[in-house]
Amino acid sequence: MDTSGHFHDSGVGDLDEDPKCPCPSSGDEQQQQQQQQQQQQPPPPAPPAAPQQPLGPSLQPQPPQLQQQQQQQQQQQQQQPPHPLSQLAQLQSQPVHPGLLHSSPTAFRAPPSSNSTAILHPSSRQGSQLNLNDHLLGHSPSSTATSGPGGGSRHRQASPLVHRRDSNPFTEIAMSSCKYSGGVMKPLSRLSASRRNLIEAETEGQPLQLFSPSNPPEIVISSREDNHAHQTLLHHPNATHNHQHAGTTASSTTFPKANKRKNQNIGYKLGHRRALFEKRKRLSDYALIFGMFGIVVMVIETELSWGLYSKDSMFSLALKCLISLSTIILLGLIIAYHTREVQLFVIDNGADDWRIAMTYERILYISLEMLVCAIHPIPGEYKFFWTARLAFSYTPSRAEADVDIILSIPMFLRLYLIARVMLLHSKLFTDASSRSIGALNKINFNTRFVMKTLMTICPGTVLLVFSISLWIIAAWTVRVCERYHDQQDVTSNFLGAMWLISITFLSIGYGDMVPHTYCGKGVCLLTGIMGAGCTALVVAVVARKLELTKAEKHVHNFMMDTQLTKRIKNAAANVLRETWLIYKHTKLLKKIDHAKVRKHQRKFLQAIHQLRSVKMEQRKLSDQANTLVDLSKMQNVMYDLITELNDRSEDLEKQIGSLESKLEHLTASFNSLPLLIADTLRQQQQQLLSAIIEARGVSVAVGTTHTPISDSPIGVSSTSFPTPYTSSSSC
């Protein structure tokens, strides 16, 4: 309750701050303000109390004051006129006392008497909120209020349900994402709680004001939307109309605010998703860095421990500890990476629980990745006996080898992180436009798609880098596997191992160098398989590079067509020439030379065969020119023609429609023509009759011969007009 006599309630447990006082004041300042208000305003009379109910314990020391207030109130009631029955019915249907809104059960609560004149106008919505408010006041353990100085009372604390209802939607989204995704953001404080604390500090020292029946207080109950739309409702007699108008305005603003919250939720999700994308990319980069660092340190430790110092030295222990530290960091980065993956899955699919994303396939994939990245040389010296059979002598060989070999070679499996980094840094994956187009075409942007695009853009570079990397790694692996059983230092030498890998990679296999151990044989087997695939890719890339482009094909086809046209013309000319020569030597000459005739006949047949062969080549060239590109061009031409035909058909339909409208107009005109003709004939007949009557009148006045008057109604004799049964002489 503020100083103006208004009781504001923002729903259950939600109290808006007073706009006049933006910050809380201290206790001394509040006491001074209360004293000034008490000096300026006289104490109003108290509301009537029921005589059958005793007063609360907090007001028992003041019975004389209450009696005086009751007497004054009774006098005012006698002076006031009676109220209408409609207002009393409203009062009986919804009995609401102002003290129920902010007072505690132990404080003074005066029940309304039977003849109370406090007229209230609550709506059905307000009444339901008041009943809920009373229920929470009576049943909530946190709704008790402590009386402050000056007879004031503190506002009740909100229940957990009320606190959940008053929370900001943006804060709720952030808190829910933190709850389900594993703490991406720090928990944010609830805005409504801070506002409630501010209101408690402001209204702590305000005294409880009592109103007389002649000036009843207005109880304004509004929702959070009403408080945002209307911060303060003034106290005036026409309160019902203004409160209904405010309720209508608040209900009209509900849907835009819901849409705004929805837009805020979508914007927050998109921003959160973008942040997760960036974090996932950085985690992948860091994982690749630490993975490559562990591989490099492993290679250095293996080479140094073979030639310079032993496995039990401090240098080897320090390097292995460094490898273990980098492996632990790598495992943590991988866990963080998959955490971001799960969070992205939750955001993309709108899931409520992150456990929905943990399918058996994902769990198996994460476990396999953790196992691959966890393999590394353990600090310390561990040995085992390794037995093998030499290649050419077939004698068994037994040597004591380090366990680090078994744990070092699988560390090269960490190179799969390169493909992940390439995917996350690819423009096709990071560009929003390309991802939108791919989603419309149902394309999955994965590592396979990125490698295909790289093979299309720069196939030579990709094959070169892959072949050289595979060559070096396989050669070093063969060297490590063969060093314990190679007594002649052939395959254990790095250059010799590179030669062995190269001839195996190219599927040559001279046989001068062969591996002794199963480890080396397995590496050579994998190298041969990869070499066959790379060789096929090289052949395909070279063939694609040697293929003519579209422009080059068109130029080549044009030149070949020109040459074939010339050859056809030459062959046709030869046919005509030989035909003329044969006719000349057989018909025109007196003495026939049979040798020349046979010669020209032979050339004539050769010219005919040459003409046929050239025409066949021209047909083949035309068939080769009809490629897919030409078909697409023809399709475009046909599409243009069909479009033009459609336009013309539309124009023709429009013209036919105009002709139909004109024909309808002509039909209507022809239908109205008989009526027009009848009207015209009638008018002419009337004019003729009038002319005859005028002529007859003139003849009578002059004294001409008398014409007998006809018996017709218009005064014209039947003999004046010829009939079909009278001749022209009778007329």
Curated annotation (Swiss-Prot):
Positions with biased composition (Low complexity): 30-40, 52-95, 138-147, 717-731
Start and end residues of each stretch annotated as Calmodulin-binding: 561-637
GO CC terms: neuron projection; neuronal cell body; plasma membrane; Z disc
Protein keywords: Calmodulin-binding, Cell membrane, Coiled coil, Cytoplasm, Disease variant, Ion channel, Ion transport, Membrane, Phosphoprotein, Transmembrane, Transmembrane helix, Transport
Keyword Coiled coil found: yes
GO molecular function: calmodulin binding; inward rectifier potassium channel activity; small conductance calcium-activated potassium channel activity
UniProt-listed GO biological process terms: potassium ion transmembrane transport
Gene3D superfamilies: 1.10.287.70
Biased composition (Pro residues): 41-51
Intracellular or extracellular location(s): Cell membrane; Cytoplasm, Myofibril, Sarcomere, Z line
Activity-regulation annotation: Inhibited by bee venom neurotoxin apamin.
Protein's UniProt keywords contain Phosphoprotein: yes
Residues modified to Phosphoserine: S167
UniProt membrane topology term: Multi-pass membrane protein
UniProt feature: intramembrane region: 494-514
Pfam families documented for this protein: CaMBD, Ion_trans_2, SK_channel
Source organism superkingdom: Eukaryota
Annotated region (Disordered), positions in chain: 1-170, 239-258, 709-731
Purpose: Small conductance calcium-activated potassium channel that mediates the voltage-independent transmembrane transfer of potassium across the cell membrane through a constitutive interaction with calmodulin which binds the intracellular calcium allowing its opening. The current is characterized by a voltage-independent activation, an intracellular calcium concentration increase-dependent activation and a single-channel conductance of 10 picosiemens.
Disease: Zimmermann-Laband syndrome 3: A form of Zimmermann-Laband syndrome, a rare developmental disorder characterized by facial dysmorphism with bulbous nose and thick floppy ears, gingival enlargement, hypoplasia or aplasia of terminal phalanges and nails, hypertrichosis, joint hyperextensibility, and hepatosplenomegaly. Some patients manifest intellectual disability with or without epilepsy. ZLS3 inheritance is autosomal dominant.
Domain notes: The coiled-coil domaim mediates heteromeic assembly.
Subunit structure: Homodimer. Heteromultimer with KCNN2 or KCNN1; this modulates plasma membrane expression and consequently the small conductance calcium-activated potassium channel activity. The complex is composed of 4 channel subunits each of which binds to a calmodulin subunit which regulates the channel activity through calcium-binding. Interacts with CALM1.
Name of the protein: Small conductance calcium-activated potassium channel protein 3
Taxonomic source organism: Homo sapiens
Lineage: Eukaryota, Metazoa, Chordata, Craniata, Vertebrata
